[in-house]
């Protein structure tokens, strides 16, 4: 049968190569990580003992003359003079906003007669007439107001210092004209000053407009003497008076830099959104008692705008120092009680781990000078109804706390796909009005926030603030430290798996039922399963090894392993006796279920509960019991094989995940039956049960004890054609006893005959099973 593929996986009959282990370690997320508090985040402090580079003193000084800088293209800031210092370049500067202004500065050497020269301006070749009959240098300012016009000679600067200037201010572009040492400024108006970009072909300096007198002095008399030692720039005493500038929303400042590493200070305005999560567990019994109401860590991903930039952020919220409360309304089974419910108060802390996709979190490995300032937020509790079978429901309501920023450290958030270097913000709590109470009980007037409904209908709570840190990062911005590279492998794999899942699910409707049943009868093993994948025939053994390793950690394999272990222990502990039945191990497997049934009432509720508990384990019997009929495992393997053959996204690294996921998720709504003489007993995973006669399909009372005995002694049959379908088929078409038995046993030949006859009832049932084979 097709289920040979799953049986073969469960036998673990393939070796594991060291190279496969190494690849797995590099591509899979970490396992068995204990994190406290909260299952997603842990705190660690960064080392701060590395050697510093160049360190500025505490006085911020804006130099008069900043530079020199290499030729470049950029959008210069407003209110800063660009002091141009050419050597012998013919084109000094090009500037335009591509709407109403095009400016070019040309340099002409002394003693040049009237002549036409060729220049390349803004990518266009132009012939321009120039003349310089003086012994000084001349800067020709060429201007046009639209892209189709020709350049006109607008201004001339005659200079013996060979310096020119360019400034963006108010709604104009400013330059120098006249003759040194009496050159002055002039302007050209524009309606779009902010978009003016420049291409500078010479070395240049930057001077604040507040020091414009110095710029005029340099243009007319030349630059001051320069010393070629590091960090020494002649500045005027007046430059120590710094014009106040408002801090930017996002700031990346280089503190120090060497050849390989640099210290970057990141200042960020952030918006933190978080929510609480909780776990509410109800005790068994009559439905009047609750076991636990507790806080759980909660992940939240969101987007927001920061200085016009879209930011993607991720937070994890967890709590520490909770207070355990309880309520006991009485000793009777119908008395309301809560064994434990958690409340956060003044002695508690709330941790919010924050990460966003900005540069600040890209290389957060070595960090110092970490500081933050955040607002406070009030969190109020909502109502939670304790739904009891009879009587008025108790309601837990109210409660509130305020969160106040109390510190920040480094942390790591762990999600299903990636680990994130984060900042952990710690908040202390103060209790607020109103207190919380439990309506219809004696509990009232207690302060704090209970875990029953901590979000009170809010999608999230929001805190605004700002953080600053200095991080040691590679000097090359294109390089990422290995801690982030190691986790992107899993992200890429998940992206591939996502595409594969979408493709698999879309293929379900394209599979022919007759082809599926024919395929389900073939002995599909590991190697035939891979035959549809290109370029993997030679690597079949390696492929099987990878699939085997992944499958060993699946829930199905774990259940089989636990079943085998429990049966072995039971068999070894039973003394040999003639009274012991040959299937003692099977009896032990069902003993706990039988004991539960023995102590239960005959109500429909309890029978449903017990059959549901049994049916969860019937799948193991489906694997371990070989029958001649078709089962759900056969259909799962056949659908999987068909989809693998048709898929365009299958790759060797995605196949193990797909096969493992299919074993867990294909056909989740399964039904099983056992056959004894003329009676059939059937149960599904939802706890629904039927007992009926083969001849008439008349329902008879369902005996749970008899069902357990039959499961122990007889093969478990997959209900490919379930009771409702059989009854519908008999009522509309009428079927013989022989056909009924064949359909009950899931005989594939009879199924094929009904489908070939285009029977809509049988065909629809098989199509429903195929559509359940989704990832």
Swiss-Prot record:
The keyword Transferase does not apply. One of its GO terms (cellular component) is viral outer capsid. It comes from the Viruses. Residues 247-478 are annotated as: Spike body and stalk (antigen domain). Residues 483-510 form a coiled coil. A motif (DGE motif) lies at residues 307-309. Keywords: Capsid protein, Coiled coil, Disulfide bond, Hemagglutinin, Host cell membrane, Host cytoplasm, Host cytoskeleton, Host endoplasmic reticulum, Host membrane, Host-virus interaction, Membrane, Outer capsid protein, Viral attachment to host cell, Viral penetration into host cytoplasm, Viral penetration via permeabilization of host membrane, Virion, Virus entry into host cell. Residues 509-775 are annotated as: Spike foot. One of its GO terms (biological process) is virion attachment to host cell. Residues 388-408 are annotated as: Hydrophobic. Disulfide bonds join 317-379. Residues 65-223 are annotated as: Spike head. A motif (YGL motif) lies at residues 447-449. The record marks 230-231, 240-241, 246-247 as: Cleavage. A motif (KID motif) lies at residues 643-645. This strain probably does not use sialic acid to attach to the host cell. In group A rotaviruses, VP4 defines the P serotype. Belongs to the rotavirus VP4 family. This is Outer capsid protein VP4.
């Amino acid at each position: 049968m097709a289920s040979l593929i799953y049986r073969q996986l469960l036998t673990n009959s393939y070796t594991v190569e060291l190279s496969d282990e190494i690849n797995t370690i590099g591509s899979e997320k970490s396992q068995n990580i204990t994190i406290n508090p909260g299952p997603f985040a842990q705190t660690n402090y960064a080392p701060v003992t590395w050697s510093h580079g160049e360190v500025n003193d505490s006085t911020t000084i804006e130099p008069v003359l900043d530079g020199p800088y290499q030729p470049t293209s950029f959008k210069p800031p407003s209110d800063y003079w660009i002091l141009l210092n050419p050597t012998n370049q013919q084109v000094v500067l090009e500037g335009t906003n591509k709407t109403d202004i095009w400016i070019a500065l040309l340099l002409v050497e002394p003693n040049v007669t009237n002549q036409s020269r060729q220049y390349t301006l803004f990518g266009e070749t132009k012939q321009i007439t120039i003349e310089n009959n003086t012994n000084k240098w001349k800067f020709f300012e060429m201007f046009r107001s639209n892209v189709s016009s020709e350049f006109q000679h607008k201004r001339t600067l005659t200079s013996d210092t060979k310096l020119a200037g360019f400034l963006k201010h108010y709604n104009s572009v400013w330059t120098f004209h006249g003759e040194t040492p009496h050159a002055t400024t002039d302007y050209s108006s524009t309606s779009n000053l902010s978009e003016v970009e420049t291409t500078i072909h010479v070395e240049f300096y930057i001077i604040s407009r507040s020091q414009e007198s110095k710029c005029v002095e340099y243009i007319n008399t030349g630059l001051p003497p320069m010393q070629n030692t590091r960090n020494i720039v002649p500045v005027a005493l007046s430059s120590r008076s710094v014009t106040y500038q408002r801090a930017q929303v996002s700031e990346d400042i280089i503190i120090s830099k060497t050849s390989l590493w640099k210290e970057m200070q990141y200042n960020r305005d952030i918006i933190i959104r978080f929510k609480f999560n909780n776990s509410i567990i109800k005790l068994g019994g009559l439905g009047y008692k609750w076991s636990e109401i507790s806080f759980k860590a909660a992940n939240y991903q969101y987007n927001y705008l920061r200085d016009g930039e879209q930011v993607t952020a991720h937070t994890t919220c967890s709590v520490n120092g909770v207070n355990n409360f309880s309520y006991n309304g009485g000793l009777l089974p119908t008395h309301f009680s809560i064994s434990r419910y958690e409340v956060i108060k003044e002695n508690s802390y709330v941790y919010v781990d924050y990460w966003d996709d900005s540069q600040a979190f890209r290389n957060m490995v070595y960090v110092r000078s970490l500081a933050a300032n955040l607002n406070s937020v009030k969190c109020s509790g909502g109502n939670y109804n304790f739904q009891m079978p009879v009587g008025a429901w108790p309601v837990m309501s109210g409660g509130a706390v305020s969160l106040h920023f109390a510190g920040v450290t480094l942390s790591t958030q762990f999600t299903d796909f990636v680990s994130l270097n984060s900042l952990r913000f710690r908040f202390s709590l103060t209790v607020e009005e109103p207190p919380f109470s439990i309506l219809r009980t004696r509990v009232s007037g207690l302060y704090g926030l209970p875990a029953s409904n901590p979000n009170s209908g809010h999608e999230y709570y929001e805190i605004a603030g700002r953080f600053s840190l200095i991080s040691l990062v590679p000097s090359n911005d294109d390089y990422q430290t290995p801690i982030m590279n190691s986790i992107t492998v899993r992200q890429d794999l998940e992206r591939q798996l996502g595409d594969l899942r979408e493709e698999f699910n879309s293929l379900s409707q394209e599979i022919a039922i007759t082809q599926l049943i024919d395929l389900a009868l073939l002995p599909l093993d590991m190697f035939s399963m891979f035959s549809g994948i290109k370029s993997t025939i030679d690597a079949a053994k390696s492929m099987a090894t990878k699939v085997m390793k992944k499958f060993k950690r699946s829930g199905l394999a774990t259940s089989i392993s636990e079943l085998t272990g429990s049966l072995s222990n039971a068999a070894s502990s039973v003394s040999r006796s003639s009274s012991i039945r040959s299937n003692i191990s099977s009896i032990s497997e069902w003993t706990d279920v039988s004991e539960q049934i023995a102590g239960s009432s005959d109500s429909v509720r309890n029978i449903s509960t017990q059959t549901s508990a049994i049916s969860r384990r019937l799948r193991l019997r489906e694997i371990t019991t070989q029958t001649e009929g078709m089962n759900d495992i056969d259909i799962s393997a056949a659908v999987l094989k068909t989809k693998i053959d048709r898929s365009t996204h299958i790759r060797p690294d995605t196949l193990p995940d797909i096969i493992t996921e299919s074993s867990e998720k294909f056909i989740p709504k399964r039904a099983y039956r056992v056959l004894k003489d003329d009676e059939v007993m059937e149960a599904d995973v939802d706890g629904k049960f039927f007992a009926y006669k083969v001849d008439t399909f008349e329902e008879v009372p369902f005996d749970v004890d008899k069902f357990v005995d039959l499961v122990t002694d007889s093969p478990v049959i997959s209900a490919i054609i379930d009771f409702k379908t059989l009854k519908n088929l008999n009522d509309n078409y009428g079927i013989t006893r022989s056909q009924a038995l064949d359909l009950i046993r899931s005989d594939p030949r009879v199924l094929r005959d009904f489908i070939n006859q285009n029977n809509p009832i049988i065909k629809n049932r098989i199509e429903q099973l195929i559509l359940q084979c989704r990832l």
